[in-house]
Amino acid sequence: MAQTWHRRWDDSYAEAAFKNRLNLPIKYVKLNKDAVKPEYSQDGDAGMDLTATSFRVTDTFMEYGTGIAVQIPENHVGLLFPRSSITKSAPGVSLKNSVGVIDSNYRGEILVRFELPYPGTVYRTIPIVGDRVAQLVIIPYPRVKFVEVDKLSDTNRGEGGFGSTDKQ
């Protein structure tokens, strides 16, 4: 029995499992003719670029539609981040909810909403339809179960919160 277990978890098994994680198929639907398949720009990129197919703006936000819906596998999550070029060209602009979370059971269009921190400000450069506006990072996550206890284990940090690791 131990021999079977060992064979199952040898290097070739681990390598095959890892390669399957590297080529995780993600189903997607183009919701309009201008939609662009999310893709990595370069080898080594963690996020796939999302391209704007629609745009609307109010006094407090600008919103881009990507024209795509995705089917993220169970036990995975899509995290949405702004491209650095957005924050470089429009200082102070950030994603409305900091990081977008796309759950595996969501099937609607991926929308990217940026907060405009200074109402009435005219930005010289903002992304337009056809520009890459965000990055989608898909990662696995554990399904956790909280267990109530009377006391947590002790650590060097203890209850030190904001900025506590800078103080010795």
List each model region and its residues:
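DUTPase catalytic domain/fold
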Residues: M1-Q168
